[in-house]
A protein has these predicted regions:
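Mobile cap/lid helix-loop segments that gate and shape the active-site cleft of serine hydrolases
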Residues: 43-44, 173-210, 216
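Primarily recognizes the serine-hydrolase "nucleophile elbow" in alpha/beta-hydrolase
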Residues: 122-184, 202
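Conserved alpha/beta-hydrolase "acid-adjacent" motif
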Residues: 227-236
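N-terminal cap/lid segment of alpha/beta-hydrolase-fold proteins
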Residues: 12-66
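Short beta-strand element of the alpha/beta-hydrolase
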Residues: 68-77
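Catalytic nucleophile-loop/oxyanion-hole region of alpha/beta-hydrolase
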Residues: 82-85, 89, 101-139, 261-266
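Short beta-strand/loop motif that positions the catalytic acidic residue
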Residues: 214, 220-222, 226
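C-terminal catalytic histidine-bearing segment of alpha/beta-hydrolase fold enzymes
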Residues: 235-284
Length: 284
């Protein structure tokens, strides 16, 4: 593992030993925005990080001899409360010749979401600089699950035209914040927007309302029986994409709950076919 530190942190932070590289972009003292987290970062269960105060990328290099030039930033889910690292997903992308970077982003910490968005956009921009990894800057996309799915769609709308990701792949992503009804969603909203948030804030960060003709091409995966994030969230996002003429594809599995693990082989095949459709992987 190679560790590249672009800034120093006064707090104890987490690096992941399984990655080919760990790159720190910044922390609360060196970034433009802060999430005001003062506690040390901590593992509380396997592959789950809490109390983040710095942005790091855990990079898994594309398999030798298979490099497609594509890179993907993976935004972990965890209700904006913690980050559940998807190691197997990163390893699968790497095996397909796609450089994968799990983004340890700064959690919003009860309303400081500017830091979260800064980290997500910074990850995309950083990957575009890594020509030494064989990355084509025009082939950098994003993916994420649940809250990470929300962040991936947010990035695809918030980044300036000309900088947007080449593709977006939300996995059971949280989209419609202002109509979220579950207790889990309410807790996530407090983490994202802060205690005592008003409904307008939830509307402003509902990403289906951000979509325009410049939104990145998007491939959505949902499960019909998801009780945490209703599949209608993804449907609303898909409909917004279609209305604005954005390339889009949506797959709703009949079962699986708040996960697509039961459909791994299917969704992985569909991802590769989507990337071929976009012209990012050449047909053989």
């Amino acid at each position: 593992m190679v560790i590249v530190a672009l800034s120093a942190s006064a707090q104890k932070t987490i690096s992941y030993e399984g990655a080919d590289e760990t790159v720190r972009l910044w922390d609360n003292k060196t970034a433009k925005h802060t999430n005001y987290e003062t506690r040390d970062e901590a593992w509380k269960k396997k592959n789950s990080i809490w109390q983040t105060s710095s942005c790091e990328l855990y990079i898994f290099k594309a398999a030798e001899g298979k490099n497609t030039g594509i890179a993907v930033a993976i935004f972990p889910g965890g209700s904006y409360t913690n980050l559940n690292l998807q190691i197997s997903l990163a390893q699968w992308y790497a095996s397909q010749g796609i450089t994968a970077a799990i983004v340890k982003y700064r959690l919003p910490n009860r309303g400081h979401y500017e830091a979260t968005l800064e980290d997500a956009m910074g990850a995309v921009r950083y990957l575009r600089t890594r020509s030494d990894l064989g990355i084509d800057p025009a082939k950098v996309g994003v993916t994420g699950s649940s809250a990470g799915g929300h962040l991936s769609t947010w990035v695809s709308n918030a980044m300036p035209v000309g900088e947007k990701p080449a593709f977006v792949i939300p996995l059971y992503g949280w989209i419609n914040l202002y109509e979220s009804k579950s207790l889990a969603a309410e807790k996530a909203l407090v983490q994202l927007l802060g205690p005592g948030y008003n409904s307008q804030k939830a509307i402003n960060l509902s990403t289906h309302l951000m979509v325009d003709e410049n939104t990145s091409p998007t491939l959505l995966f949902l499960c019909y029986d998801d009780s945490l994030v209703p599949s209608t969230d993804g449907v609303e996002y898909y409909e917004a994409l279609v209305r604005h003429g954005v390339k889009a594809s949506m797959h709703i599995f009949p079962f699986g709950g708040h996960s697509v693990k039961k459909h791994t082989a299917e969704y992985q095949t569909l991802i590769i076919e989507w990337l071929k459709y976009l012209g990012l992987i050449s047909e053989k």
